[in-house]
């Protein structure tokens, strides 16, 4: 389950982490919860710019330095800044950032990891043993056989679509499913969340997804 006191949202600058620090008994409890939350998809944060949005009056300078150190060492982030949640309404990314989409014209081979905060379109196959972590949608013009995590950070409106949808594991937000064994799709399919489960439907060009 996702801790609602720590929200992770992608935007065009990087990743926002919104922490309701008043819900934790102390800094140590918050830090432990944050590390646990981010460890779900650790490689997603490598090389990312992070913005920590929280009530800064509850974090002293020594604690902020320690927090940064943990993020740099454990998650290999590129940069980390702080924003006081009480100063102004934070510009949090909600839903899918439709204007930011990355196109990859290649096969993603086993052992490769792809991280992106927006949507990603892959023109080629995603082989078994590969991993994809994105903040928005995943669309594959080929076979998707690796691990795919769309809506990373809790975006339950994200979708995963492929010409041949047969992933080792598929995750949207915090929900996870697997492909049925020995079931090769006969048509393009779309996976999305409906209610509290991931459903897979045939792709219909004229149907809104």
Swiss-Prot record:
Keywords: Cell cycle, Cell division, Septation. One of its GO terms (biological process) is division septum assembly. Transmembrane segments: none annotated. Pfam families: MinC_C, MinC_N_1. SUPFAM superfamilies: Cell-division inhibitor MinC, C-terminal domain (SSF63848). Gene3D superfamilies: 2.160.20.70, 3.30.160.540. HAMAP family: MinC. Belongs to the MinC family. Cell division inhibitor that blocks the formation of polar Z ring septums. Rapidly oscillates between the poles of the cell to destabilize FtsZ filaments that have formed before they mature into polar Z rings. Prevents FtsZ polymerization. Interacts with MinD and FtsZ. This is Probable septum site-determining protein MinC.
